[in-house]
Every structure is written in C-alpha cells, then in structure tokens.
C-alpha cells in the first residue's frame, strides 16, 4: 500500500514537472535583467554599446541564451526567446568588434560569426532564417534589430510573453509609420519603403495576401490606408543604411 502511494506521488510530481517545463525553459533567460540593461543603454533606439562592454550582467545573458532549452516551448514562448536572443547576440557581435557595414563586414557579422543558442552553434543569419522566420510571424521583422541605422529601433524593453502581441503590434506600427523609414505620398500615389519589405515580401504576402494589404493594417494616415487597400501605390525601396545604430 505504501509503495502504491509512493508510486502515485512520484507520478503526480512528474506530471507537475512536465506541465511546468515550458515556463521553466523560458525562465532560463532572465528577461527582467535584459530589460534593465536596455533601459541603461538605449535611448530612442540609439544604443550606447559601451554600457554593455565588460559587463558581467550582459555576459550572463549570453550564457543563458546558450543554455536555454527550447524543446518544451510553444510558438509564443519561442518567439519571445528568439527575438530577445537575436537582439542580445547582435549586440554581442558589436561588442566583439563585428560590424554590419560593408559587404565583407556584413558577411562576417551575419554569416561567419557563430553563437551558442539553445545548445546549437549558429550565426545570426541562421537564427533569423532557420529559427525565427519559420514561426510565421512577419512582425518579427520590426522586432529583431541588426545594429544598423535603417533597422527597426532597439526598444528600451525586452519582449515578454505577457505583452508579446502588444509589443509586436507597437513595433510594427512604429516602424511602418516612421517617415525616415517609410513614406506614403498620397497625391503622387508613390510609396518609398524600407528595403525590409523587399527582402521579406513573401512573409508579408503570406500573412495578408499582398504587401500593400499588410501595410494597410498599420498605416495611420487614412488616405494612405484607402490607397493601400486598393493596391494603388507605386512602390519603390529606400537605400539601406548599414551604419551602426549607436556608439561602441
């Protein structure tokens, strides 16, 4: 009888452990600590990377990115982890002397340099294209930040599970309505868009049927929305500025 009670108790504990696994896995990355570091170093998207240099708190985050187990995570938990991981490691690359400027610099920064992510040794390019994009969330293109001036701004807060939808919507709206990155001339019916919309057009088309339909969900100007919904804009793409989004 005692052995049966012990067996049932052990089974119950195992079930509780399995149920808690996703939350535990996500908790391996100290998101509040990342938010604190962002608040200390980021102002209106401008990053003072020197605040994270030789910083044991930042180094601890890169270790956590390496050790986190994503096996039990659901889609939303993976989005939170991978978005934060990308932004942490993009900064790590800058601190290690990397740069997205120049063709060679971009190749080294995005493809050659490797990082430990959830038990794998991968590049920023692989992290984006093989781990994040397969989650089918086009708003990630406004959340992951490649340390360049034309990238979306790095926000002064980490992405969290509780606020993920709100944060992604905010990131998309802020980026699309930023006149330095996208402009909509309703009189001439011409749109000058970030090259992000050219490079990843298939992601936006898959989500909304067309690029202009996707943009219409976030654009604030009502006249521009009307034209976008009628696919009436002639679209061109802006030159991408790969200069650093802050200082080392």
Feature-to-residue mapping (PLM):
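N-terminal signal peptide c-region/cleavage motif recognized by signal peptidases
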Residues: 20-22
């Amino acid at each position: 009888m005692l052995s049966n009670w012990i067996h049932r108790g052990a089974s119950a504990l195992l079930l509780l452990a399995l149920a808690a696994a996703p939350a535990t896995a996500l908790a391996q990355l100290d998101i509040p600590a990342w938010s604190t570091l962002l608040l200390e170093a980021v102002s209106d998207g401008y990053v003072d990377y020197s605040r994270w240099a030789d910083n044991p708190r930042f180094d601890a985050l890169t270790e956590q990115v390496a050790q986190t187990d994503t096996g039990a995570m659901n889609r939303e938990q993976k989005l939170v982890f991978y978005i934060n991981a990308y932004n942490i490691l993009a900064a790590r690359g800058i601190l290690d002397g990397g740069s997205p400027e120049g063709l060679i610099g971009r190749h080294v920064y995005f493809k050659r340099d490797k990082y430990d992510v959830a038990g794998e040794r991968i590049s920023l390019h692989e992290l984006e294209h093989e781990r994040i994009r397969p989650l089918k969330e086009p708003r990630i293109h406004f959340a992951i930040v490649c340390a360049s001036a034309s990238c979306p701004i790095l926000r002064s807060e980490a992405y969290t599970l509780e606020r993920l939808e709100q944060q992604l919507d905010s990131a998309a709206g802020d980026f699309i309505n930023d006149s330095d990155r996208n402009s909509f001339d309703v009189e001439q019916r011409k749109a000058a868009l970030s090259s992000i919309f050219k490079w990843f057009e298939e992601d936006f088309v898959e989500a909304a049927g067309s690029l202009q339909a996707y943009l219409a969900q976030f654009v604030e100007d009502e006249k521009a929305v009307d034209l976008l919904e009628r696919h009436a804009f002639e679209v061109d793409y802006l030159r991408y500025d790969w200069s650093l989004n802050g200082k080392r």
